[in-house]
Amino acid sequence: MIKLGIVMDPIANINIKKDSSFAMLLEAQRRGYELHYMEMGDLYLINGEARAHTRTLNVKQNYEEWFSFVGEQDLPLADLDVILMRKDPPFDTEFIYATYILERAEEKGTLIVNKPQSLRDCNEKLFTAWFSDLTPETLVTRNKAQLKAFWEKHSDIILKPLDGMGGASIFRVKEGDPNLGVIAETLTEHGTRYCMAQNYLPAIKDGDKRVLVVDGEPVPYCLARIPQGGETRGNLAAGGRGEPRPLTESDWKIARQIGPTLKEKGLIFVGLDIIGDRLTEINVTSPTCIREIEAEFPVSITGMLMDAIEARLQQQ
């Protein structure tokens, strides 16, 4: 029997209709896996050994009562076959410390999804720089004058922090906007933090597409997140409307070009953000949108993921 651990935000607070981690747990349980639940505070290192206080978990598709704990134990993480790192951002120093603990278990043979080193290496905004032929025009800087020059060149730009999620602190600055200076100062904290500028993509009106990639293989359907009521952000957390769709030809092209790199880096479950035919983000920490896509199309994304995990476990 496969022992699967999951590190996540409190399961009592999730919305099971939309929660991708919950969908993964349902599929793992359906396959007869033993589920071990952990929050960040349950992980610890003792004399170099990664351990955790885990609670054995049962889950069910029931909006009143979706989980129950059936046991608890303190164990070496190396006792688990696979651990899903599903803690939501912020990607802060605490998150980084947790990846080091998980890496100690990985060295003993536990499969970590996604690979701890790659979680540290691949910032969701900056990692797109390795695929700059696929992205919008992009500037990463702390320098206000450079931001101003970029804005003057493109006249309609998007500014965002490198560590936000859910559309937080994303600004659109159009031609003649008197607020560029204050936005630049706010995002860079007066030149002490990097931010990202990209030329505005009018295709956002048709949606910001979340394309999921499972161990290098694109899922054939995506979720387009369409901005509502004059918003420039499609993120569901910012009020965008989700619309599942088949991948377009350019979606396939982008996902297939990036897929082999993701696989090689042990990034087994990844969400690409695509606007029109441009890649804007590579989400590696805790990608979502499984449930919305599975509800609309005959595809089991969680099945693809567990198949990929089982294949990797057999290779070890």
Curated annotation (Swiss-Prot):
Note on cofactor: Binds 1 Mg(2+) or Mn(2+) ion per subunit.
Question: Which HAMAP family does the entry link to?
Answer: GSH_S
- State the reactions this protein catalyses: gamma-L-glutamyl-L-cysteine + glycine + ATP = glutathione + ADP + phosphate + H(+)
Q: Which family does the similarity line name?
A: Belongs to the prokaryotic GSH synthase family.
Task: State the protein's name.
Answer: Glutathione synthetase
| UniProt-listed PROSITE patterns | ATP_GRASP
Enzyme nomenclature, EC number: 6.3.2.3
